[in-house]
A protein has these predicted regions:
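Residue-level signature of mid-helix packing/kink "hotspots" within the transmembrane helices
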Residues: 18-26, 110-111, 226-230, 234, ...
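Conserved MFS/SLC helix-loop-helix module at the cytosolic interface between two early adjacent transmembrane helices
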Residues: 23-59
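Cytoplasmic helix-loop-helix junction between adjacent transmembrane helices
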Residues: 67-108
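Helix-loop-helix hairpin linking two adjacent transmembrane segments in secondary transporters
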Residues: 101-149
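Extracytoplasmic gate region of multi-pass secondary transporters
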Residues: 182-223, 230-233
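C-terminal transmembrane helical hairpin of 12-TM major facilitator-type secondary transporters
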Residues: 246-294
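A late C-terminal transmembrane helix in Major Facilitator Superfamily
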Residues: 305-337
C-alpha cells in the first residue's frame, strides 16, 4: 500500500523473485556444478544480503521489482546445489528422508515471513525488515562457510590429487540434461504444482482482507496454510523411504489440490468460511507431497551424478516460470470475475496437466561419481 501497488502488480511482485529462475535456472545449475556446490550456496546468500540492503532505500514499485529479480539470482545459486550437496553428505539409505525435509524450504520460509513479517514491520517499518533479512543472509553465508565441508574436504585431499574427478564441459552437461526425458517431466510437473500453490497461498492475505479480516489475522491464517505444506513434504520423504511409488504420491498430490481448491473457492462453500479454510489447509498439506517427491526424483532421473544440479536447475527454471505466471494469471481472472470464485478452475487445469505428465515419470539412478 505504501508504494501504491495494484493487485496485478502485487502478483508480479510476488513472483518477480522467480524471474531469474525462469530465464536462467538451468544455467545457474550449470554454474553451481562448475564452481562447486558450497561456493554456489555462499554466493547466493551473499546476493540475498546485498539485495536486502538495497531494499532499504527503495522508493518506487519499479525499483522493487528489479531488486526482486536480482534477489532471484541469489535464490537460484543458494538452492539449486542443495539436493546434490545432500546426496554427497547423506548415506544412500537416508537420502529420501533428507530430501523430503529439503522440500519444505519454500513453505517454511513463507510461513516464517508471514508470521514474523507483519510484527517486525509494525516495530521497525518495512525498511527494518529488509535490514534484518540482510543480516540473516550474511550470517547464513558465514555458517555455510564454517560448517559445510568443501568439495576437497569431502573427497579427501589425497584422493582429489591422485584420482581427480573427470570433468565435462558445461555445454555437454546441458545437452545431456535437456535431451533426457526425465528432467523434462519432473520440471513440467513441478511448474504445475508451484504455479497454483504460490497463487493460492500468496493471495490468501488479500482474499481474507477483502472478507473483512484484520491484516494480522489474515497473515496468521496464511502462515499456517503455508506451514502445513511442510507436513506433506516430510511425509513424502518418509513414504519414499518405505518404498511407496513416487508416481502414486504425485497422483495423490494433484488430485487433492484439485478437490480442495474447489472447496476453498467454489460457490458451493460460499457461506462456509471455516470449511473453506480447512480446504486451504488440506490443499497445502497434501499438495506438499509433490515437492518432496520431485526433489527426491531429481537426483535419480539426472543423466549422471555430474548433472544433478543442472537437472535441479532445469526443474527450478520451469517451476519459476509457473510461479512467475501463476499469481498474475489468477489475479487477472479474479479481476474479470469480480472475486476469487473461479480460482479453482486455474488450479484444476494445472493439476490436470501435472497428472498427465506424472503418469510418464520413471525412476532411474544416475551413474555414480567416479
Amino acid at each position: 500500500d505504501a508504494l501504491g501497488i495494484t493487485l496485478v502488480q502485487g502478483g508480479f511482485l510476488l513472483s518477480m523473485v522467480q524471474m531469474a529462475g525462469m530465464l536462467v535456472g538451468v544455467f545457474a545449475g550449470l554454474t553451481a556444478d562448475g564452481i562447486g556446490l558450497r561456493r554456489s550456496v555462499i554466493a547466493g546468500q551473499c546476493i540475498f544480503a546485498l539485495a536486502s540492503l538495497g531494499g532499504i532505500w527503495v522508493g518506487q514499485a519499479e525499483h522493487l521489482l528489479l531488486l526482486r529479480a536480482f534477489e532471484g539470482l541469489g535464490f537460484l545459486l543458494a538452492v539449486l546445489p542443495v539436493p546434490s550437496l545432500i546426496r554427497q553428505l547423506v548415506s544412500p539409505e537416508r537420502l529420501a528422508l533428507h530430501l523430503g525435509f529439503w522440500g519444505t524450504y519454500m513453505a517454511t520460509g513463507t510461513a516464517i515471513a508471514l508470521f514474523g513479517g507483519p510484527l517486525l514491520m509494525g516495530l521497525t517499518g518495512w525498511q527494518g525488515l529488509w535490514g534484518l533479512l540482510a543480516v540473516v543472509s550474511a550470517l547464513m553465508a558465514l555458517w555455510v562457510w564454517l560448517q559445510v565441508p568443501s568439495e576437497r574436504q569431502r573427497l579427501g585431499a589425497l584422493a582429489a590429487a591422485t584420482n581427480p574427478v573427470p570433468t565435462e564441459s558445461a555445454l555437454a552437461r546441458l545437452r545431456l540434461t535437456l535431451t533426457s526425458a526425465g528432467p523434462w517431466r519432473i520440471a513440467i510437473v513441478f511448474s504445475m504444482y508451484s504455479s497454483q500453490w504460490l497463487a493460492v497461498i500468496g493471495f490468501l492475505p488479500s482474499v481474507y482482507a477483502q472478507a473483512g479480516l484484520s491484516s494480522q489475522t489474515a497473515g496468521a491464517l496464511t502462515a499456517l496454510a503455508s506451514l502445513v505444506n511442510v507436513t506433506g513434504s516430510i511425509a513424502a520423504g518418509r513414504l519414499l523411504h518405505r518404498g511407496v511409488c513416487s508416481r502414486h504420491l504425485l497422483y495423490l498430490g494433484f488430485i487433492s489440490m484439485t478437490l480442495t481448491a474447489f472447496l476453498a473457492f467454489g460457490p458451493l462453500t460460499a457461506d462456509a468460511p471455516v470449511l473453506r479454510y480447512l480446504a486451504v489447509l488440506l490443499f497445502s498439506a497434501i499438495g506438499g507431497v509433490i515437492p518432496g517427491t520431485l526433489f527426491s526424483l531429481a537426483v535419480h532421473v539426472a543423466p549422471n551424478a555430474r548433472t544433478v544440479s543442472t537437472t535441479v536447475g532445469w526443474m527450478q527454471q520451469c517451476s519459476s516460470a509457473g510461479q512467475f505466471l501463476g499469481p498474475p494469471l489468477v489475479a487477472w481472472v479474479a479481476g474479470l470475475a469480480g472475486g476469487w470464485q473461479w480460482t479453482w478452475t486455474m488450479t484444476g487445469a494445472a493439476s490436470l496437466v501435472g497428472l498427465l505428465i506424472a503418469s510418464g515419470v520413471t525412476l532411474r539412478r544416475p551413474d555414480p561419481m567416479p
